[in-house]
Amino acid sequence: MALKPLGDRIVVHFEETEEKTASGFVLAGASHEATKTAEVLAVGEGIRTLTGELIALSVAAGDKVLVENGAGVNVKDGDDSVSIIREADILAVLA
């Protein structure tokens, strides 16, 4: 991975989902859902308080998370398509 996120940013890879209608048409899975599942690939160091104390992020590389649909920015990392989101965009860590 060539991307190293800064601050409270997190690099994730969204799981691709597709649905088919009864007649076989493929629908874009994430287009109508409110949330998406993603795997955390890399995390920033965290955020600093006004006093300079570093607060680490609550997730780590390898975690599966539930993210708001439409959150973040899509970028290319070599041949891979990943997204950079903020920790606040994560709704839950999946167990």
From Swiss-Prot:
Keywords from the named record: Chaperone, Cytoplasm
A GO cellular-component term linked to this record: cytoplasm
GO biological process: chaperone cofactor-dependent protein refolding
One Gene Ontology molecular-function label: ATP binding
Compartments, as annotated in UniProt: Cytoplasm
SMART domains per the UniProt record, alphabetical: Cpn10
InterPro entries reported for this sequence: Chaperonin_GroES, Chaperonin_GroES_sf, GroES-like_sf
Gene3D superfamilies, per database record: GroES chaperonin
HAMAP family: CH10 (MF_00580)
Quaternary assembly: Heptamer of 7 subunits arranged in a ring. Interacts with the chaperonin GroEL.
Function: Together with the chaperonin GroEL, plays an essential role in assisting protein folding. The GroEL-GroES system forms a nano-cage that allows encapsulation of the non-native substrate proteins and provides a physical environment optimized to promote and accelerate protein folding. GroES binds to the apical surface of the GroEL ring, thereby capping the opening of the GroEL channel.
Family: Belongs to the GroES chaperonin family.
Protein name: Co-chaperonin GroES
Protein's organism: Streptococcus salivarius
